[in-house]
Amino acid sequence: MASPPDTDGFSDVRKVGYLRKPKSMHKRFFVLRAASEAGGPARLEYYENEKKWRHKSSAPKRSIPLESCFNINKRADSKNKHLVALYTRDEHFAIAADSEAEQDSWYQALLQLHNRAKAHHDGAGGGCGGSCSGSSGVGEAGEDLSYDTGPGPAFKEVWQVILKPKGLGQTKNLIGIYRLCLTSKTISFVKLNSEAAAVVLQLMNIRRCGHSENFFFIEVGRSAVTGPGEFWMQVDDSVVAQNMHETILEAMRAMSDEFRPRTKSQSSSSCSNPISVPLRRHHLNNPPPSQVGLTRRSRTESITATSPASMVGGKPGSFRVRASSDGEGTMSRPASVDGSPVSPSTNRTHAHRHRGSSRLHPPLNHSRSIPMPSSRCSPSATSPVSLSSSSTSGHGSTSDCLFPRRSSASVSGSPSDGGFISSDEYGSSPCDFRSSFRSVTPDSLGHTPPARGEEELSNYICMGGKGASTLTAPNGHYILSRGGNGHRYIPGATMGTSPALTGDEAAGAADLDNRFRKRTHSAGTSPTISHQKTPSQSSVVSIEEYTEMMPAAYPPGGGSGGRLPGYRHSAFVPTHSYPEEGLEMHHLERRGGHHRPDSSNLHTDDGYMPMSPGVAPVPSNRKGNGDYMPMSPKSVSAPQQIINPIRRHPQRVDPNGYMMMSPSGSCSPDIGGGSCSSSSISAAPSGSSYGKPWTNGVGGHHTHALPHAKPPVESGGGKLLPCTGDYMNMSPVGDSNTSSPSECYYGPEDPQHKPVLSYYSLPRSFKHTQRPGEPEEGARHQHLRLSSSSGRLRYTATAEDSSSSTSSDSLGGGYCGARPESSVTHPHHHALQPHLPRKVDTAAQTNSRLARPTRLSLGDPKASTLPRVREQQQQQQQQQQSSLHPPEPKSPGEYVNIEFGSGQPGYLAGPATSRSSPSVRCLPQLHPAPREETGSEEYMNMDLGPGRRATWQESGGVELGRVGPAPPGAASICRPTRSVPNSRGDYMTMQIGCPRQSYVDTSPVAPVSYADMRTGIAAEKVSLPRTTGAAPPPSSTASASASVTPQGAAEQAAHSSLLGGPQGPGGMSAFTRVNLSPNHNQSAKVIRADTQGCRRRHSSETFSAPTRAANTVSFGAGAAGGGSGGGSEDVKRHSSASFENVWLRPGDLGGASKESAPGCGAAGGLEKSLNYIDLDLVKDVKQHPQDCPSQQQSLPPPPPHQPLGSNEGSSPRRSSEDLSTYASINFQKQPEDRQ
């Protein structure tokens, strides 16, 4: 517009021109006048047209004194893109320009005059000074609010809105026309015609804002003066609403940027200031709420205007670029450094970028150090988080810190920091403090000090089959394999090798730790610290306490892989809370494959106390393996095995690697003492190392204790062979078949490994702590457990880890697995066997026991367990006897095998090719040590089914001769002495209610130490030849026949089949017949023929009543008595056998029974003799009690060497053998009878 004429009337005119009125769009002639003495104050006037103005024909249509305006802004709406709005106390006046240039020229002129007017007005009584120069004001958004004369400070933006009666508008009575006035830090609602703001909200209190069409809303949080809620307002149109939204967001972002740097105290330069970089709420300085909101919002939008404060400071650079968004890597946060809307982003981008990059990446690389705030000094600082907030400084460092997201949480950040916890981004556990501590670096929590390689992040427990179980560091820290690497986190190791560890162990531990410990929680803190249970630490602690779940054990020999013995002890008992933890021990023991006999190392108490009622803690001789006590009442679930069920390592885990969980069955991890676990044969003593956790360390205790090396499961070079059998069958029936994965047992790979049967896992007598005399291992080998409830037999031959851990599994894997060769007598095979791998591999596993998995628990889960106390006694005796013979595994015959079908060919060792007889035949070779080979089955089968042929007649070397049908009453228990390798079947079958086919010895060679007891029918026909040398006459019962002779005899027996062996058929029945007389609880009890002390079994519940006892010599008694005649009933229950052996009276059994009783003595010889009796009495015990007695009565006398009742059997040797002879039938109801 042309300059106003230079006439007196126009001397004060600054600008004139045609502009439009926004609503009507009519053009009007506007005149901007400056203040003058003649004309008055500065004002904006408009006329209908220029002619009227020039001729002064009329007064202006309207005149607006600029000093009355509290704000002048540029605006735009749906109709007009170029508006200039003037807000006065009572109205809003706008003019529309045709172009942006025109708009800007008018805007600048108005601002200049407005500023002067305000200055004059301030001088007079002053309003807001014109501190803000027009230029400065323009700089920001072109709208400097510095000119305001209005009711408050200058406003960056002012919108006239109508507050709606909704949300806070209603509750706070803020309804009607208001001016929404925006400053760099606040939003104010000023009511029309009012000079005072009704409400002033901090931008930082705004949670969010938005618009919908011509409505705009703001949501504020609790910190707002109004309290939480929303303000809804209506504006002219959606364009205005959108403009409000964008402008407020910008202000929030700007404030956020500005505020952050301030809050950070520009420590960009000083790393020392670790300002927590929390996502700031930005409350600190009440940064403009906008910032807060901005924080939430992407900061992509560049700020239009620099916040005046920053501008005023004139240090645009000072503003901190750091944006939380920076952390996000968005450079977008635009604080305008120079005030130009764009520039901020630019500057900031650079600073941020360089800083951010380091931040982003370094955290990834950073060592775990949780940098202290100070540490984070340089943006590039390695500290991942550089948490220390310091980074704020103007550049990126802050962002780095702030941006925990990238890194794991920044430690330095205050908890409030948003990033603080987010640290986990990298995968540190989500909430874990420790992860946040992990310093940003995802992996490093406390690694920093050790700063282990990422490889270490392995605080996770390894669930993989191969991982070793967790180790406990001597310091008590648990070594956990985390991250599935199977690596253990060894806090102590991390911190430094625990002194307790031997050098190599320590090295191994360190190595282990290094390799695996990716995420140790220690933030470079000492292990102690790591383990402190701080909130963050708690997770760590829990980790420590966490047990490794990996089924497979670490390769014991595997360098670091080997357990550190020191860990075993770790003070951190909880670590071992898990039975599996115990498993660790053998690894520890065998660090690097070298066995660490040191019980101290290996046997640190696990801190686990067995709670199971029936279980007696395993003797200390378990060497700390017994620290773990199973809590299950009768059956132990064998987490150990489960956890490290097999220390499979290269070798296959014993099929027993799984522990039967069936409530009724206790797992029958008869692993011979975890021989597998023993790192080497030499470690054999620790052979049960595996079992350690289970069974109160049953496996473990023998492992170490066993004098003779049992065949360590570890097949190779001190590597633990997986000793399995810790798996407990949970199936209601207790069917061990579940364990069928004979693969475990039979793992072709290493038959060598004796599976550590669940036996070790067993908490209680299952394990039969080794008897004093007996090598723990050997004893185990000798024992077969019968669990009436579990329906599993426990073959604990240590040597034969494969003892059926789960009833069938162990059996199948182990006993049946006995290969025919096992028929061959191997005296002391057990002892010799130690080197043989426990693994029950197909035939390969000499140790294999019955292959057939079938075992039914007799229905009482508890029945399965025999009193542990007895068992312990038994173990003690066994140990004593073990000197005589490698004790058979002390498996209490807690499992009852029930076969319904006839014609089952005996329980064959699953993989084992031999199985002389179809019935289970433990190869005679299943010597105490080589139990696997020893044929005696120690298992008594009770067949419900008709025509079950007990193939028990496997005679060890000699065919028992197919036993003709035993006398109807006779339940023949032919159990080759354990010592007699040949004795094949230590399996006694009891058929109830079905005519039993005479047991035919399937394999001529192996006498089946299998006694058939049929309750309902005459198993009667089954008789095992008694004669040791001669083929046993069919009628001759296999009473547990262990040679009466001392060990030599036992050995003989072992060599010869129990029944068919040189010992003669009599040798077969190491097992006493069970008298099922109605007066006695007929319910199926586990009857365990205990071949002499070798395997003392106390039948926790014996069939025979005391009355029977008279006839019967308890094996234990015989064993204990060493020579004491077995005739006395008293003896029957005495602990000597460490279990009650109930021998049927000869009267009950008939002549045979007598022989059977003598068999007891023989049992020593026959230690292999039937250790297990399976009674299918559960169903019809009551019904057929008569039969049982008859059977028992009819049972042929045991061969001379037969343990039953024979005075010989009483001999100490016999006692050792007695262990094998264990007769116990547990029924559910009564404690004794378990009826």
UniProtKB/Swiss-Prot annotation:
The modification Phosphotyrosine is found at Y460, Y608, Y628, Y658, Y895, Y939, Y987, Y1172, Y1222. Interacts with SOCS7. Interacts (via IRS-type PTB domain) with IGF1R and INSR (via the tyrosine-phosphorylated NPXY motif). Interacts with UBTF, FER and PIK3CA. Interacts (via phosphorylated YXXM motifs) with PIK3R1. Interacts with ROCK1. Interacts (via PH domain) with PHIP. Interacts with GRB2. Interacts with ALK. Interacts with EIF2AK2/PKR. Interacts with GKAP1. Interacts with DGKZ in the absence of insulin; insulin stimulation decreases this interaction. Found in a ternary complex with DGKZ and PIP5K1A in the absence of insulin stimulation. A motif (YXXM motif 2) lies at residues 546-549. This is Insulin receptor substrate 1. One of its GO terms (biological process) is cell migration. The modification Phosphothreonine is found at T441, T448, T502. Residues 522-539, 1072-1084, 1101-1114, 1204-1229 have a biased composition (Polar residues). Residues 265-276, 378-399, 407-419, 669-689, 785-794, 801-810, 872-881, 1025-1046 have a biased composition (Low complexity). There is a cross-link at K1179 (Glycyl lysine isopeptide (Lys-Gly) (interchain with G-Cter in ubiquitin)). Pfam families: IRS, PH. Its main location: cytoplasm. One of its GO terms (cellular component) is nucleus. A motif (YXXM motif 7) lies at residues 939-942.
